[in-house]
């Protein structure tokens, strides 16, 4: 069932009786973690915010990647559930093999958290992940896991998380696409260079494809829905599907620099990514998404059918003006 909210959202409400939960949110000072916390509080649930560095609103300062089992059990004691809103972003590029870094950032902390959560009796969990696992599931012929270490790490994260949690601790995997919106001191990482570009008067170019998109608030709502349901499902989050050209055009308009977006020929897109892959190879850098295979992503329509279509314009404007 659903209920109409005064803020204009139609929020899902599970049919079973909802009790007041106490939820620990790891990465709660980040963009998505902030909106998960806001939604939990809006619905009357108790929260504990965990982050690596102290700042306003952080209840516990802890690095879960380095915490002991005893520390994690103490952190989780008395909570009904846990949300992991941290991890290594797909855009991070460093020298050396990326696989171990992705495992240490995306897999190991989730396993440690869920092992502790199971021990102390938590009954629900959610992991904020990536919509690339959705596409690997529905389009195995694309070979995303074989081509991209980041996708492999997210698949491993989901699999081992559920194995660790066991049958009495359902784990929802929140599959997050391109996100718009802001939080105090936070914007989407991908948006920084793009917003700088659209704020200039430089010509705008885009491939022919596009992507599912959502607001940070939409991620918060989907995550809390999953927690209230004690869901163990894979949950792709989408409010609107945008072509790249439309996304750039709307961002430019929101930034006060409206202008046309030209379509890049597919051959040019492929050549650019091949060149980028060679440069990374020469410099010894390995990204989470293999650059020479990115053309297949940017030239496709990475669309997801939205269960409740909604414009992301408000969040898009926030992003462009941040």
Language-model regions: role of each:
Residues 23-43:
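N-terminal Rossmann NAD(P)H-binding glycine-rich loop of SDR-like oxidoreductase domains
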Residues 55-58, 62-108:
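NAD(P)H-binding glycine-rich loop region in Rossmannoid oxidoreductase-like domains
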Residues 138-238:
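Oxidoreductase cofactor-interface core, primarily capturing Rossmann-like NAD(P)-dependent enzymes
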Residues 244, 248-298:
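Terminal hydrophobic/aromatic helix or amphipathic segment near a protein terminus
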Residues 296-322:
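Amphipathic terminal alpha-helices
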Residues 49-54:
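N-terminal Rossmann-fold cofactor-binding loop
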Residues 210-217, 235-254, 267-271, 310:
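Substrate-binding strand-loop-helix patch
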Residues 108-152:
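Conserved Rossmann-fold NAD(P)-dependent oxidoreductase catalytic core, especially the SDR/UDP-sugar
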């Amino acid at each position: 069932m659903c209920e109409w909210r005064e803020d204009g959202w139609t929020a899902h409400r599970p049919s079973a009786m909802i009790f007041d939960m106490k939820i620990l949110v790891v990465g709660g000072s980040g963009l998505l973690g902030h909106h998960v916390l806001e939604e939990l509080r809006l619905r009357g649930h108790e929260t504990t915010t965990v982050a690596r560095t102290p700042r306003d609103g952080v209840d516990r300062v802890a690095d879960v990647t380095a915490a002991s089992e005893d520390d994690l059990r103490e952190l989780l004691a008395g909570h009904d559930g846990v949300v992991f809103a941290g991890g290594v972003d797909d855009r991070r590029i460093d020298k050396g093999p990326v696989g171990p870094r992705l495992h240490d950032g995306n897999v190991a902390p989730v396993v440690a958290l869920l092992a502790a959560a199971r021990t102390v009796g938590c009954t629900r969990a959610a992991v904020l992940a990536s919509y690339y696992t959705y596409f690997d599931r529905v389009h195995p012929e694309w070979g995303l896991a074989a081509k991209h270490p980041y996708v492999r790490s997210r698949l491993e994260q989901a699999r081992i998380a559920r194995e660790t949690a066991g049958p009495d601790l359902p784990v929802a995997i929140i599959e997050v696409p391109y996100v718009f919106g802001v939080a105090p001191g936070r914007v989407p990482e991908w948006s920084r260079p793009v917003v700088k570009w659209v704020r200039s008067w430089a010509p705008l170019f885009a491939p022919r494809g596009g992507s599912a998109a959502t607001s940070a608030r939409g991620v918060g709502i989907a995550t809390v829905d999953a927690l209230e349901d004690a869901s163990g499902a894979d949950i792709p989050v989408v409010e609107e599907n945008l072509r790249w050209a439309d996304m750039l055009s709307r961002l430019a308009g929101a930034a006060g620099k409206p202008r046309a977006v030209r379509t890049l020929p597919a051959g040019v897109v492929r050549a650019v990514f091949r060149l980028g892959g060679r440069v990374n190879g020469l410099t010894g850098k390995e990204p989470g998404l293999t650059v020479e295979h990115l053309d297949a992503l940017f030239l496709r329509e990475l669309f997801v059918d939205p269960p409740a279509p909604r414009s992301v314009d408000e969040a898009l404007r926030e992003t462009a003006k941040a």
